[in-house]
Amino acid sequence: MRQAFKVVLSILMLWVTVAHAEVRIEITQGVDSARPIGVVPFKWTGAGNAPEEIGAIVGADLRNSGKFNPIDISRMPQQPTTTSEVTPAAWSALGIDAVVVGQIQPSADGGFLISYQLVDTASAPGTVLAQDQFKVTKQWLRYAAHTASDQVFEKLTGIKGAFRTRLAYIVKTNGGKYPYELRVSDYDGYNQFTVHRSPEPLMSPAWSPDGAKLAYVTFESGRSALVIQTLASGEVRQVASFPRHNGAPAFSPDGSKLAFALSKSGSLNLYVMDLGSAQIRQITDGRSNNTEPSWMPDNQTLVYTSDQGGRPQLYKTDINGGAPQRLTWEGTQNQDADVSADGNFVMMVSSESGKQHIAKQDLATGAVQILTDTFLDETPSIAPNGTMVIYSSTQGLGTVLQLVSTDGRFKARLPATDGQVKFPAWSPYL
């Protein structure tokens, strides 16, 4: 646990932080039908108020997953703080089969010790299903809470939790010398940082698979350029700045390659750079436009948008050669692909009858499900555990970030108060 904190700290501590209005998750649909669970306020043994409401953070994480509906404190039959204090029958009578209890106490060195227990209240009443403790400093209290949430979530669902992940996105503010900002926050909008500010547009951030770098598009040189920024040091490496368009970067799952789109020869085509040697290979050719690459888990196959059939649709191709294969057939057009980490499905922007929504296509069966009903949806990005998708949509005169579960049942938004937010990218596990 401590080593995990050190690794993430090495990535975060050198970023420039700026006081901004942060985004916060506002649930709009689906939590009422989720699995009920009890998350009791953690007991604070120090003086005054607790430095963080750890139980509230864990409860919010589980609620934000769309799979759990933590019972309100006012409805709790009791507020135990240890396993021995839990009365299983009181909880199971409310349809709750698991309860989280915990404690937070100050330590002599100025840090804090957090401990929790996940208690079964139904099938094996009183049994501890999961437990852990974390010794942390104040700035890592939320991270420790997210760690507990990850463990509880995985124990109850069998799916790895993604509460210790982050979001990258572009914010366009009104006025000022640097109206375009690349920002990063925790998945829930807390701990927001500014990575880069620019007087010119920024676009399309993409995470490296180790979470240490971001690739993005900048127009600061007077034309588009692709760069990779190392987050801990701030070092920027220019990848491509050819005439016309340079865009749509995507790291391969193993981190050895970067795919992107260039129009240096006329139409847009896909290219792949070996990041070790800096050698660039052209992958697609012809007069059609080919862009927005997303990698399959094999590190050899790209899913991308092409208008070779007339309107934009999704295709896939092997980067080592071979004919492209069309993937999408439903809808007027489909674009902006993001392939799930397991390669089982792809998220995309699907257009039909003037509507533009986020859709999911099963890559084995071809079945398509429209997930959203928001307006002018764009740029979906899948959480690393495959359960949630973040995307941008138009709301009023601006753009905001939205969340939807990959089954379409749970929906939420992350409104920002100081600008328009676009191009969200969900980090890998950190």
From Swiss-Prot:
Supply the Gene3D superfamilies for this chain. Answer: TolB, C-terminal domain, TolB, N-terminal domain
Coiled coil region boundaries: none
Q: Does the keyword Signal apply?
A: yes
Any single GO BP term: protein import
Q: Where does the UniProt annotation place the signal sequence?
A: 1-21
**Subcellular location, principal:** periplasm
Give the UniProt keywords, A-Z: Cell cycle, Cell division, Periplasm, Signal
Q: Which Pfam families match?
A: PD40, TolB_N
Where are the bilayer-spanning segments? none
Question: What SUPFAM superfamilies has UniProt attached to this entry?
Answer: TolB, N-terminal domain, Tricorn protease N-terminal domain
InterPro entries hit by this protein = 6-blade_b-propeller_TolB-like, PD40, Tol-Pal_TolB, TolB_N
Q: Name one GO cellular component term.
A: periplasmic space
Where in or outside the cell?
Periplasm
Describe its function. Answer: Part of the Tol-Pal system, which plays a role in outer membrane invagination during cell division and is important for maintaining outer membrane integrity. TolB occupies a key intermediary position in the Tol-Pal system because it communicates directly with both membrane-embedded components, Pal in the outer membrane and TolA in the inner membrane.
NCBIfam families per the record?
A: propeller_TolB
Tell me the subunit arrangement: The Tol-Pal system is composed of five core proteins: the inner membrane proteins TolA, TolQ and TolR, the periplasmic protein TolB and the outer membrane protein Pal. They form a network linking the inner and outer membranes and the peptidoglycan layer.
| Similarity comment: family membership | Belongs to the TolB family.
Protein name per UniProt: Tol-Pal system protein TolB
Q: Which organism is it from?
A: Photorhabdus laumondii subsp. laumondii (strain DSM 15139 / CIP 105565 / TT01)
